[in-house]
Amino acid sequence: MVQHLSAEEIIQYISDAKKSTPLKVYVNGNFDGVTFPDSFKVFGSDNSKVIFCEADDWKPFYESNQSTITELEIEMDRRNSAIPLKDLTNTNARIEPGAFIREQAIIEDGAVVMMGATINIGAVVGEGTMIDMNATLGGRATTGKNVHVGAGAVLAGVIEPPSASPVVIDDNVLIGANAVILEGVHVGEGAIVAAGAIVTQDVPAGAVVAGTPAKVIKQTSEVEDSKREIVSALRKLND
């Protein structure tokens, strides 16, 4: 299983990161003779521009050129953000629109991350693992291979306090919709966590747990194969 960053490494990364407030600015006006700062990315025609820049750089530019601007619209979706979204260019996985994956998360080959899922810094999505819609992997949460994390499920994150242990999910585990796995819990290989369960203690390999708090109700050997099948076709990428 891939090793995640330690809590101390993540804390240092966040502390040292330059905090960013990026803007997307739509602006109309007369820009003849206007010099745009080198830090701006500027697109458009003579009288209509789209500008990508930092808020701290935009303010002095706007104050100096306000008289040339006739219309203005600004989009800002974060403030003093320390962790950018992950660059997925070289990620060999299926990532659907609307997934939020932060830098320093690890997405292994053949994984699937569905719409609305959130993968926080230091989390690991194992090879062939599916993170379903609106599921959350908190900081340092780690899954093995061929895991299914159901829609709306939460694998709690641990960055603060740094001494806390992360959630660890072994290979071939099924986690039902809206289940919650609390900090420090280890779910053993091939286990099944029922929908809506709240897991507060380690789950043995091959066990089926359900309830609040979750308790072992049977073994996976008692569950029909069709109800615990991981479908490889859903993980297939282009040939």
Curated annotation (Swiss-Prot):
GO terms for biological process: diaminopimelate biosynthetic process; lysine biosynthetic process via diaminopimelate. PROSITE patterns: HEXAPEP_TRANSFERASES (PS00101). GO terms for molecular function: tetrahydrodipicolinate N-acetyltransferase activity. Its EC number is 2.3.1.89. Pathway: Amino-acid biosynthesis; L-lysine biosynthesis via DAP pathway; LL-2,6-diaminopimelate from (S)-tetrahydrodipicolinate (acetylase route): step 1/3. Gene3D superfamilies: Hexapeptide repeat proteins, Malonyl-CoA ACP transacylase, ACP-binding. Keywords: Acyltransferase, Amino-acid biosynthesis, Diaminopimelate biosynthesis, Lysine biosynthesis, Repeat, Transferase. It catalyses: (S)-2,3,4,5-tetrahydrodipicolinate + acetyl-CoA + H2O = L-2-acetamido-6-oxoheptanedioate + CoA. It is an enzyme of class 2 (transferase). Catalyzes the transfer of an acetyl group from acetyl-CoA to tetrahydrodipicolinate. Belongs to the transferase hexapeptide repeat family. DapH subfamily. This is 2,3,4,5-tetrahydropyridine-2,6-dicarboxylate N-acetyltransferase. It comes from Staphylococcus haemolyticus (strain JCSC1435). The gene is dapH.
